[in-house]
């Protein structure tokens, strides 16, 4: 399979931009990868998940056929009856954050909870606490809004 992949990178003209690693995925160091492709049974995906979650935020993970259970994919596609899943490694954002709003008003406090790329929390500003709405975490990019925001 690795030889097949190498040939395809040459045919596509990207061989100088791709490194194909052939080996035991639980032994090889692929921590610098920007894309990891998997075709592993579900239990192996789950064994590998802690290692994947330590990778640089923004790293893309693609799996043929098998998902990661409670870690919902960022995207699902199908080819016939075969699903494909992709995830983007999220930054760890859970915790307490304090910042000064752009208008220079009193400091605001943001309390975030996180499960993979799913984020929720509360924003306390001017003595009022409210939930963050529509939070989206994609790699190291977090966006949300709150009542009173434009």
Task: Report each predicted region and the residues it spans.
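Structural recognition of the beta-strand scaffold that forms the well-ordered cores
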Residues: 19, 37-38, 62-63
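A short SAM/SAH-binding and catalytic strip from SAM-dependent methyltransferases
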Residues: 26-53
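Short beta->alpha connector loops
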Residues: 40-45, 67-69, 103-104, 126
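Central antiparallel beta-sheet cores of small beta-barrel/beta-sandwich binding domains
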Residues: 94-150
